[in-house]
C-alpha cells in the first residue's frame, strides 16, 4: 500500500528567510556603524584641518606676529627686554572721548577754512588734559625681586636713577591695586631702613631702603632699592598708571643714597661686560619697544652709529645746534629722554616756530593740531660738530581724527626748563636707535629699522 507523505517546508522557508533577513540586517548595521565611525573621523579631520588653516590665517596673514624679534631676542648675546608703551596720544584720546570733545576739536579745525573757530565755548577748563598727560610716555617691562621672584611691572626711566617698588607696608590708595613687595617672603632680604623721599615732575613718593636679589631677564644680582610706603603725593598718576615701580636708568648724581644705577651695578658685579643700554622703538608698532642691556644689538639699526659726548653727567644731555624752519638755536642743550613722548621746546621759541605754519592750539587742551599733509611743516635738524640728525613731519605728527580731512596732533610741546633746553623724546628715539653709554659718557644714534 503506497503511503502518501506530505512535508510542509513553509515554516523552514520562513525561518530561513527570517535568518537571511536577520543576517542582512546585522550586516547592514555593521556597515552603518563602520560608516558612522568613518563619518566621525571625517568630521574630526575636517575640523582639525580647518582649524589649523584658520589658525594659520589668523597668525600669519590677518594678525601676523613679528617672528624676527623673537629670533633676535632668543639668539642675542645681550639681554633684551620687550616692553609695552603707554603714550600721551592714548590718554588724550581717552579724555577727548570721555568729555565728548570730538566736535569741539572738529570746530577748531575750521580755522583752516575761515581763520576763526565757530564755537569757541564748546569746551571748558574742567575738560583739560594736563601738560604731564601730553609730555609723559611710560615704558612698562617686567622684573622680579627676592629669591621667590616677586613680579612687578616697571617703568624704564632715563630721567631718574633709583629703583623702587611699593611695599607690603604701603596702605595708601595707590597701593591697593599694585603688586606689593613682601620682604617676609624672601630669604635673601637684607634690612636697611633708611628713610627717603623721591621727587618727580608728577609728584613724590616716600619709603625706606632695602636690599634683595633683583632679577631682570636672566640676570640676578643683589641690589639696594627703595620700598615705597606712601604714594599719596604721586596721585593720580600712580593709581591710573599700569606700573608698580620705576627702574631708573639715569646717572648716579641723580640717585638718592648715592646708589649706582642698575646697569652700572650689573657691570660692577661682572654680570655684563659693558655699562651700556639701548632703546629700539619700532616705527610700525607704537605700543612696543625693546631695551637691550650690556651691549648693542646691531640687528635693530642700519648704517653706522655716531656718538655725541655728554655735556654733563646728570642727564643724558648733549650740545646740539637746532634748526626748526627759519629758527636756529646754537649750542642748545638736548636731553635724550625715554620718559617724554614729544619733542619739547621753550614756550617763546615754540610760539615763534608755529607762526605761519597753520598749527592750532586747542583751547583748554595742551594740544596742537594741524592737517596731516600740511606742506608748511619743516624737517627739523639737530647738528653737532660732526653729525646731522633730521626729523621729518611723519615722525612728529600723530593722526587723531579723520573728518574727510586727516587731522594730526603735533608732538612738539612747550616745556620751560632753561632758555635753550630741549628734550628729544619718543619721536626722535623712534627714528633713531639710541645707545646710552655709561662707560664712555656718550649717547649714540643710528637709523632704526622701520621693520625687522
Curated annotation (Swiss-Prot):
- State which residue ranges cross the membrane: 38-58
| Location, primary (coarse class) | membrane
Question: Superkingdom of the source?
Answer: Eukaryota
| Subcellular location, record wording | Membrane; Vacuole lumen; Vacuole membrane
Show the disulfide pairing.
Answer: 170-175, 372-408
What is the activity's pH dependence per the UniProt entry? Optimum pH is 4.5-5.
Q: Which residues lie on this side of the membrane: Cytoplasmic?
A: 1-37
Which loops or segments lie on the Lumenal side of the membrane, by the record?
Answer: 59-452
Reactions mediated catalytically = Hydrolysis of the 33-Phe-|-Leu-34 bond in the alpha-chain of hemoglobin, leading to denaturation of molecule
Q: Which UniProt keywords apply?
A: Aspartyl protease, Disulfide bond, Hydrolase, Membrane, Protease, Signal-anchor, Transmembrane, Transmembrane helix, Vacuole, Zymogen
Propeptide residues according to the Swiss-Prot or TrEMBL record: 1-123
Inhibition and activation profile: Inhibited by pepstatin A.
Q: What is its EC number?
A: 3.4.23.38
The record places domain Peptidase A1 at 139-446
Amino-acid biosynthesis as a keyword?
no
Membrane topology is: Single-pass type II membrane protein
- Can you tell me which residues the record assigns to a coiled coil? none
Q: Which InterPro entries would you find in this protein's record?
A: Aspartic_peptidase_A1, Aspartic_peptidase_AS, Pepsin-like_dom, PEPTIDASE_A1, Peptidase_aspartic_dom_sf
Q: Which GO MF terms are attached to this record? A: aspartic-type endopeptidase activity
Q: One GO CC annotation, please? A: food vacuole
Q: What class of enzyme is it?
A: hydrolase
Q: What family classification does the UniProt entry report for this protein?
A: Belongs to the peptidase A1 family.
Q: What does this protein do?
A: Digestion of host Hb is an essential step which provides the parasite with amino acids for protein synthesis, and regulates osmolarity.
Name under which the protein is recorded? Plasmepsin I
**To which species is this protein native?**
Plasmodium falciparum (isolate HB3)
Q: Which lineage ranks, top first, belong to the organism behind this chain?
A: Eukaryota, Sar, Alveolata, Apicomplexa, Aconoidasida
Amino acid at each position: 500500500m503506497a503511503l502518501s507523505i506530505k512535508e510542509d517546508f513553509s515554516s523552514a522557508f520562513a525561518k530561513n528567510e527570517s535568518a537571511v533577513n536577520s543576517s542582512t540586517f546585522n550586516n547592514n548595521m555593521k556597515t552603518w556603524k563602520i560608516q558612522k565611525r568613518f563619518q566621525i573621523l571625517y568630521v574630526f579631520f575636517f575640523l582639525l584641518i580647518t582649524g589649523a588653516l584658520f589658525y594659520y590665517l589668523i597668525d600669519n596673514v590677518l594678525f601676523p606676529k613679528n617672528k624676527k624679534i623673537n629670533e633676535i631676542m632668543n639668539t642675542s648675546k645681550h639681554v633684551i627686554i620687550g616692553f609695552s608703551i603707554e603714550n600721551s596720544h592714548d590718554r588724550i584720546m581717552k579724555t577727548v572721548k570721555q568729555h565728548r570733545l570730538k566736535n569741539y576739536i572738529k570746530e577748531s579745525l575750521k580755522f583752516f577754512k575761515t581763520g576763526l573757530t565757530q564755537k569757541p565755548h564748546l569746551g571748558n577748563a574742567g575738560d583739560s588734559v594736563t601738560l604731564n598727560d601730553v609730555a609723559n610716555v611710560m615704558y612698562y617691562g617686567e622684573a622680579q625681586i627676592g629669591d621667590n621672584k616677586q613680579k612687578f611691572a616697571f617703568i624704564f626711566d632715563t630721567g631718574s636713577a633709583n629703583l623702587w617698588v611699593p611695599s607690603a607696608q604701603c596702605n595708601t590708595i595707590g597701593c591697593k591695586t599694585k603688586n606689593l613687595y613682601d620682604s617676609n617672603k624672601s630669604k635673601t632680604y637684607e634690612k636697611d631702613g633708611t628713610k627717603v623721599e623721591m621727587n618727580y615732575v608728577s609728584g613724590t613718593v616716600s619709603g625706606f631702603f632695602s636690599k634683595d636679589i633683583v632679577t631682570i631677564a636672566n640676570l640676578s644680582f643683589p641690589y639696594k632699592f627703595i620700598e615705597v610706603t606712601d604714594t599719596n603725593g604721586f596721585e593720580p598718576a600712580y593709581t591710573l598708571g599700569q606700573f608698580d615701580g620705576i627702574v631708573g636708568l639715569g646717572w648716579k648724581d641723580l640717585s638718592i643714597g648715592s646708589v649706582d644705577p642698575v646697569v652700572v651695578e650689573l657691570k660692577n658685579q661682572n654680570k655684563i661686560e659693558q655699562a651700556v643700554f639701548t632703546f629700539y622703538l619700532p616705527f610700525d608698532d607704537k605700543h612696543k619697544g625693546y631695551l637691550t642691556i650690556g651691549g648693542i644689538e646691531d640687528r635693530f639699526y642700519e648704517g653706522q652709529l655716531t656718538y655725541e659726548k655728554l655735556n654733563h653727567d646728570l642727564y643724558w644731555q648733549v650740545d646740539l645746534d637746532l634748526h626748526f624752519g627759519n629758527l636756529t638755536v646754537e649750542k642748545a642743550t638736548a636731553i635724550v629722554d625715554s620718559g617724554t613722548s614729544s619733542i619739547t621746546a621753550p614756550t617763546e621759541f615754540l610760539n615763534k616756530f608755529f607762526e605761519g605754519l597753520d598749527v592750532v592750539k586747542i583751547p583748554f587742551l595742551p594740544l596742537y593740531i594741524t592737517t596731516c599733509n600740511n606742506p608748511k611743516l619743516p624737517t627739523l635738524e639737530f647738528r653737532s660738530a660732526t653729525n646731522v640728525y633730521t626729523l621729518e613731519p611723519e615722525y612728529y605728527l600723530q593722526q587723531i581724527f579723520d573728518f574727510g580731512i586727516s587731522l594730526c596732533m603735533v608732538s612738539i610741546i612747550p616745556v620751560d626748563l632753561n632758555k635753550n633746553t630741549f628734550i628729544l623724546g619718543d619721536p626722535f628715539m623712534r627714528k633713531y636707535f639710541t645707545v646710552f653709554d655709561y662707560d664712555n659718557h656718550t649717547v649714540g644714534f643710528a637709523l632704526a629699522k622701520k621693520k625687522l
